Amino acid sequence: MANPLRSEVRQLYKNLLFLGREYPKGADYFGERLKRAFMKNKDVTDPKEIKKLVDRGEFVIKELEALYYLRKYRAMKKRYYEEELSTMLNIG
């Protein structure tokens, strides 16, 4: 693997591992799947193919971030809007 791509792949792995800490099925589950995915592609040597895989990994990062933001939004909505609804019903 070429040096610049190697650093990109390592950074991608670290970022995914960090994001996996909050994965709904648990960090251990995510870590095992992540390791398996990277090990499956460890023999890829074509720089274009490696870049394509890195781009796919970055897409996964964006999807995970969206999942986490949605989960936080739902928790906040549940926390605040249910209180507001219950106070409105008590007033009326």
Swiss-Prot record:
One Pfam family cited in the UniProt record for this chain: Complex1_LYR
Query: A single GO CC term, please?
Result: mitochondrion
Assign the protein's first listed, main location to one coarse class: mitochondrion
Q: Which key words are in the record? A: Mitochondrion
What is its subcellular localisation?
Mitochondrion
Annotated GO biological processes are:
negative regulation of oxidative phosphorylation; respiratory electron transport chain
Keyword Glycosyltransferase attached: no
**What does this chain do?**
Acts as a regulator of the electron transfer flavoprotein by promoting the removal of flavin from the ETF holoenzyme (composed of etfa and etfb).
The similarity comment for this entry is: Belongs to the complex I LYR family.
| Protein name per its UniProtKB record | Electron transfer flavoprotein regulatory factor 1
Origin organism is: Salmo salar (Atlantic salmon)
- Top-level taxonomy: Eukaryota, Metazoa, Chordata, Craniata, Vertebrata
Protein encoded by which gene: etfrf1
